[in-house]
């Protein structure tokens, strides 16, 4: 089974992805991490984020062992990843990596921005997570402060709104809900309630297929 979770920045999709994967015993991939890894590689090289040739080279040289690097969670790397992820050749270079991960039995949970529309359009369950921008900015600010990083909530909100617009308007795999995705509004749900809602969606889909 493939479970696709999409949504904008700081909507809570990553936490839902991890918890769903643990619940069902599936592997989990936060696809945003792979774009952050590419972006960090370019930043470390001092390269332009729009240098598609160097970005593709970084994508092809990805080392999954680096995905746990705490530096990938920084606001700077996140903003850089949004720029890099808009490059069509970079998205193409990472397509097979993500699809091969999804095909691993007995199942996988992938979260990102184009899982249900581009990466795994045949996913068994598609969930599109949304949350108010102000709520997302507050969450992201608390996360940064918890890591010991300075964070101004007003600036974080401005960055999130800018990133939302960039993600929705990019030519390559824009952020949007798949036609058959289940909407999950995470604005006012705590983690446990959000996870329960996501599990309910998965179970409803599974029950419907068993009745067919």
From Swiss-Prot:
<dbReference type="Pfam" id="PF02224">
    <property type="entry name" value="Cytidylate_kin"/>
</dbReference>
<dbReference type="InterPro" id="IPR011994">
    <property type="entry name" value="Cytidylate_kinase_dom"/>
</dbReference>
<keyword id="KW-0808">Transferase</keyword>
<dbReference type="InterPro" id="IPR027417">
    <property type="entry name" value="P-loop_NTPase"/>
</dbReference>
<dbReference type="GO" id="GO:0036431">
    <property type="term" value="F:dCMP kinase activity"/>
</dbReference>
<dbReference type="GO" id="GO:0036430">
    <property type="term" value="F:CMP kinase activity"/>
</dbReference>
<dbReference type="GO" id="GO:0005524">
    <property type="term" value="F:ATP binding"/>
</dbReference>
<feature type="binding site">
    <location>
        <begin position="7"/>
        <end position="15"/>
    </location>
    <ligand>
        <name>ATP</name>
    </ligand>
</feature>
<keyword id="KW-0067">ATP-binding</keyword>
<keyword id="KW-0547">Nucleotide-binding</keyword>
<keyword id="KW-0963">Cytoplasm</keyword>
<comment type="similarity">
    <text>Belongs to the cytidylate kinase family. Type 1 subfamily.</text>
</comment>
<dbReference type="GO" id="GO:0005737">
    <property type="term" value="C:cytoplasm"/>
</dbReference>
<dbReference type="InterPro" id="IPR003136">
    <property type="entry name" value="Cytidylate_kin"/>
</dbReference>
<protein>
    <recommendedName>
        <fullName>Cytidylate kinase</fullName>
        <ecNumber>2.7.4.25</ecNumber>
    </recommendedName>
</protein>
<dbReference type="GO" id="GO:0006220">
    <property type="term" value="P:pyrimidine nucleotide metabolic process"/>
</dbReference>
<keyword id="KW-0418">Kinase</keyword>
């Amino acid at each position: 089974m493939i479970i696709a979770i999409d949504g904008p920045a700081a909507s809570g999709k990553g936490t839902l992805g991890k918890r769903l994967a643990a619940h069902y015993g599936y592997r989990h991939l936060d696809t945003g991490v792979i774009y952050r890894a590419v972006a960090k590689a370019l930043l470390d090289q001092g390269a332009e984020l729009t240098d598609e040739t160097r970005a593709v080279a970084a994508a092809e040289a990805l080392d999954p062992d680096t995905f746990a690097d705490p530096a990938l969670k920084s606001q700077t790397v996140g903003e850089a990843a949004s720029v890099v992820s808009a490059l069509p050749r970079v998205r193409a270079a990472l397509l097979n990596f993500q699809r091969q991960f999804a095909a691993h039995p007995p199942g996988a949970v992938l979260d990102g921005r184009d899982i249900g529309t581009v990466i795994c359009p045949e996913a068994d369950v598609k969930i599109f997570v949304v949350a108010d921008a102000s709520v997302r900015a507050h969450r992201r600010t608390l996360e940064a402060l918890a890591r010991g990083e300075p964070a101004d909530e007003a600036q974080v909100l401005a960055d999130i709104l800018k990133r939302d617009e960039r993600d929705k308007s990019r030519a390559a795999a824009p952020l949007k809900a798949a036609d058959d995705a289940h909407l999950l509004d995470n604005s006012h749900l705590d983690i446990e309630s959000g996870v329960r809602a996501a599990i309910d969606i998965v179970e409803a889909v599974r029950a419907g297929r068993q009745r067919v």
